């Protein structure tokens, strides 16, 4: 009788314990939103918001942060010149996603004293308090210093973000914490002369360890092939993948018109 009672109690408790992967709707769900597309300000710092044209206040949306590179700004993420708009993710999202492009301080993400992490925390609070977001479906991506900031989020906000995609990043925005698992995609050019290729591999290896993946060598393409090689690590608690491509320090790997990074990032996010 006692084991049966214990089992029943466990079942009852489980009904009130949400799964880690279960959708958690933000407080903005069901509200008539006041935030609109365009530039918004939090304590003197700006970000660009892009809400889907067919926004439904009762539908929980993905939330994606697009982070700019050193010397860039939030407008570079949306103008479609150095990269496809929103790193090519908006067209793939097909109305399922709210996008945010924060503006770095002094055209970068030094994250002194964690100020850039705090800024992103504040954006999340503002956006999710007004719009309907699936809080288990937050993502970040960026190139160069934006990649470094995405890596920093993976380190310190692994429990708040579902996955990151780091394009040619480095440890340049810090790594506070850095012990929790998170789905991690790295994309890096084998001839990167700014943030070396091996450094990008090392970033991924941190999450190979955190996610308890089996160790494996990262594959690389032949120089001059204009190709790429993807390594998917095995046995991970959360997925870790790394794409090495034949190129340098490129905001858009293999060119602005290439689907390599946008396709890989979007599919990785949705499968994480």
Swiss-Prot record:
Q: Which GO terms describe its molecular function?
A: feruloyl esterase activity
Residue span of the signal peptide, if any? 1-22
Q: What reactions does this protein catalyze?
A: feruloyl-polysaccharide + H2O = ferulate + polysaccharide
Q: Where is it chiefly localized? A: secreted
Entry EC number(s): 3.1.1.73
Keyword Transferase (UniProt): no
Protein's cellular compartments = Secreted
User: Which keywords label this protein?
Assistant: Carbohydrate metabolism, Hydrolase, Polysaccharide degradation, Secreted, Serine esterase, Signal, Xylan degradation
Query: What GO biological process terms does the UniProt entry carry, in alphabetical order?
Result: xylan catabolic process
Any one GO CC term of the record: extracellular region
Please state which protein family the record places this protein in.
Belongs to the faeC family.
Q: What does this protein do?
A: Involved in degradation of plant cell walls. Hydrolyzes the feruloyl-arabinose ester bond in arabinoxylans, and the feruloyl-galactose ester bond in pectin. Active against paranitrophenyl-acetate, methyl ferulate and wheat arabinoxylan.
Protein name per UniProt? Probable feruloyl esterase C
Q: Which organism is it from?
A: Neosartorya fischeri (strain ATCC 1020 / DSM 3700 / CBS 544.65 / FGSC A1164 / JCM 1740 / NRRL 181 / WB 181) (Aspergillus fischerianus)
The organism's lineage?
Eukaryota, Fungi, Dikarya, Ascomycota, Pezizomycotina
């Amino acid at each position: 009788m006692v084991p049966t009672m214990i089992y029943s109690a466990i079942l009852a408790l489980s009904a009130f314990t949400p799964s880690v992967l279960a959708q958690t709707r933000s407080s903005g769900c069901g509200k008539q939103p006041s935030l609109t597309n365009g530039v918004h300000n939090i304590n003197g710092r700006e970000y660009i918001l892009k809400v889907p044209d067919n926004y439904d206040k009762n539908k929980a949306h993905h939330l994606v942060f697009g982070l700019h590179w050193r010397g860039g700004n939030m407008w570079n993420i949306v103008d479609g010149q150095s990269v496809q708009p929103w790193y090519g993710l908006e067209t793939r999202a097909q109305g399922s996603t709210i996008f945010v492009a924060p503006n770095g301080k002094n055209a970068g993400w030094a994250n002194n004293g964690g100020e850039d992490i705090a800024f992103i925390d504040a954006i999340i609070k503002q956006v999710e308090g007004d719009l309907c977001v699936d809080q288990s479906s937050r993502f970040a991506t960026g190139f160069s210093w934006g990649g470094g900031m995405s890596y920093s989020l993976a380190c310190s906000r692994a429990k708040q973000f579902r996955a990151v995609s780091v394009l040619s990043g480095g440890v340049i925005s810090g790594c506070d914490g850095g012990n929790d698992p998170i789905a991690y995609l790295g994309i890096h050019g084998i001839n990167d002369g700014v943030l070396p290729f091996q450094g990008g591999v090392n970033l991924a290896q941190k999450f190979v360890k955190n996610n308890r993946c089996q160790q494996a060598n990262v594959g690389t393409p032949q120089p001059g092939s204009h190709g790429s090689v993807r390594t998917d690590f095995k046995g991970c608690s959360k997925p870790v993948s790394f794409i090495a491509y034949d190129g340098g320090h490129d905001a858009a790997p293999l060119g602005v018109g290439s689907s390599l990074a946008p396709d890989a990032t979007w599919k990785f996010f949705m499968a994480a």
